[in-house]
């Protein structure tokens, strides 16, 4: 018993340490365009005072619901225009998701198992990654987790307050990312009710009056913003937010970012991505799947719901014909953490079972990590020399931690190798944060370049970025930016008047010889800013 209490303190300490590692990522510089895009939209909310119809640029309507933009705008207003304001609110949401995952596990499990569920979630690679990249997915996962938590409470007690609060959380999920929040909740709740009925589980039957209360609460919270959008914009709003666009039902019928994959590839695309996102705990997945299958027949309701939550959502996104996007997987990690923690507790009682995660870590986890780095190198060959040194300290530390876990578990299975792996993972996350904090801005000094642009810009000067999206530089450069991909269009712009151009150093030869260019700024990442005067 004393040993069990000691390990509970160790798991709690590791969860708290993982939370601090997550929060330490708040001051990270902006490293990708989506964060800059969201920040630009939130900034426009504050500047225009328009909180209901959101804009990116004049005339460009945002095709996402408003909740996360509101949160970011409030954060910018409260603490200023800086990276902490851009992502701090989401880091807090990510940690709230860890707490809710712990509470869901606590409905059926002891303290140690629940702490293990929280520890798995806070150290999953993709959960840490997505927490640092502001967007809709962390908020969606949090609100649906809260909805399922209240659903479980309702199935236990049949209290109307639980039905109403579940409806409220689903409404917030819809205000975060559209109909997908409602679809996922209905499918998982329906599957849970069907399985409970078939297995004659002792769950409380719902009452239709309580269901109507939940639906009414959902409608009161979710509908007003959508009704306002329809009244102001008409059918194009319905088409964008409900039928097609980026989040409507039609989005699931065809890809919008890349070409459609062959059917067999589309169906299996998320399998390797899940193995990658679960690092360093990929080895736990087979044991979690085995425990999940057993749970469907004889397990407690909360654990059963987590199995159905992970399974239904994973099947849903796998069958969807839309783009296979890594971040869409985020919603499966809370239930996988809960089921994975149960599998680990079973392994503590039967230590030989822990050898399977060790073998899978060596045979699948490490190759998946190496394959992920190799695929990124193949996809972005020009950037390998820039980004690989940033990633290597993290990757090497994580790989060594996984090897140490596997070797120690094969030698003497138990809790200690798991604690070592969790600590090593946090060290690798900390190294990644430190490297990005110290080395990113010297490579990409966008603030310095923006200052140069502002100093040399005066109407009617044109500012062009060649063969690159404008979102990230556009966050810092406060004058209109034009994106050009075609060399002939670039040549016409260059000869048509005073022009500032951001482009890669190797693309300088594509500029016309007349008028000659003058160098205004260079970046170690290989980009330059030139002007034609």
Describe each model-derived feature in a short phrase.
Residues 2, 7, 164, 168, ...:
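Membrane-embedded architecture of ER/inner-membrane glycosylation machinery
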Residues 7-16, 101-123:
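Transmembrane-helix signature of polytopic, membrane-embedded enzymes
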Residues 19-20, 37-60, 67-70, 74, ...:
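Extracytosolic helix-loop segments that constitute the early lumenal/periplasmic catalytic or substrate-binding loops
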Residues 40-41, 176, 181-327, 335-343, ...:
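Transmembrane-lumen/periplasm boundary regions of multi-pass, lipid-linked membrane glycan transferases
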Residues 88-108, 146:
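Transmembrane-helix motifs of polytopic, lipid-linked glycan transferases
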Residues 112, 147-165, 173, 344-347:
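Membrane-interface transmembrane helices that cradle and orient dolichyl/undecaprenyl
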Residues 126-140:
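Short acidic/glycine- and proline-prone juxtamembrane loop motifs at membrane-interface regions
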Residues 139-156, 169, 335-339:
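Specific aromatic-rich, kink-prone transmembrane helix
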């Amino acid at each position: 018993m004393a040993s069990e209490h000691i390990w509970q303190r160790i798991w709690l300490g590791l969860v708290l340490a993982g939370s601090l590692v997550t929060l330490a990522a708040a001051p990270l510089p902006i490293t990708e365009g989506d964060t800059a895009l969201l920040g630009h939209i939130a900034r426009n909310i504050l500047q225009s005072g328009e909180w209901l119809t959101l804009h990116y640029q004049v005339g460009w309507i945002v095709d996402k619901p408003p909740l996360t933009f509101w949160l970011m705008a409030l954060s910018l207003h409260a603490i200023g225009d800086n990276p902490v304001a851009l992502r701090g609110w989401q880091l807090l949401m990510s940690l709230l998701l860890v707490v809710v995952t712990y509470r869901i596990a606590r409905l059926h499990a002891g303290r140690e198992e629940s702490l293990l569920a929280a520890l798995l979630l806070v150290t999953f690679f993709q959960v840490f990654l997505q927490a640092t990249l502001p967007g809709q997915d962390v908020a969606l996962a949090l609100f649906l987790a809260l909805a399922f938590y209240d659903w479980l409470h309702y199935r236990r007690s049949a209290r109307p307050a639980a039905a109403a609060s579940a409806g409220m959380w689903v409404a917030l999920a819809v205000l975060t990312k559209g109909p997908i929040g409602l679809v996922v909740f209905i499918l998982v709740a329906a599957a849970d009710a069907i399985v409970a009925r078939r297995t004659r589980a002792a769950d409380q039957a719902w009452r239709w009056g309580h269901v109507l209360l939940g639906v009414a609460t959902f409608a009161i919270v979710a509908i007003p913003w959508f009704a306002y959008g329809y009244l102001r914009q008409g059918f194009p709003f319905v088409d964008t937010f409900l039928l097609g666009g980026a989040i409507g039902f039609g989005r699931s019928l065809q890809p919008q970012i890349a070409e459609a994959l062959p059917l067999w590839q589309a169906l299996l695309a998320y399998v390797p991505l899940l193995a990658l996102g679960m690092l360093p705990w990929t080895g736990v997945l087979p044991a979690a799947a085995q425990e999940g299958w057993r749970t469907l027949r004889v397990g407690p309701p909360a654990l059963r719901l987590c199995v159905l939550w992970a399974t239904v959502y994973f099947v849903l996104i796998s069958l969807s014909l839309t783009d296979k996007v890594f971040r869409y997987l985020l919603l499966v990690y809370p239930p996988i953490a809960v089921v994975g923690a149960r599998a680990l507790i079973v392994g503590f009682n039967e230590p030989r079972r822990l050898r399977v995660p060790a073998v899978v870590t060596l045979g699948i986890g490490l190759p998946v990590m190496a394959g992920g780095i190799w695929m990124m190198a193949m996809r972005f060959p020009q950037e390998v020399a820039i980004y690989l040194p940033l990633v290597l300290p993290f990757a090497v530390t994580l790989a060594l931690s996984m090897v140490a876990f596997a070797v120690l578990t094969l030698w003497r299975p138990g809790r200690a190798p798991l604690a070592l792996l969790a600590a090593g993972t946090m060290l690798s996350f900390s190294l990644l944060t430190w490297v990005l904090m110290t080395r990113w801005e010297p490579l990409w000094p966008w603030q310095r370049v923006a200052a140069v642009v502002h100093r040399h810009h005066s109407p009617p000067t044109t500012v062009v970025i060649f063969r690159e999206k404008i979102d990230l530089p556009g966050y810092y450069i406060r004058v209109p930016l034009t994106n050009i991909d075609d060399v002939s269009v670039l040549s016409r712009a260059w000869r048509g008047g005073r022009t500032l151009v951001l482009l890669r150093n190797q693309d300088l030869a594509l500029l016309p010889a007349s008028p000659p260019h003058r160098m205004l700024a260079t970046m170690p990442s290989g980009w330059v800013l030139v002007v034609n005067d």
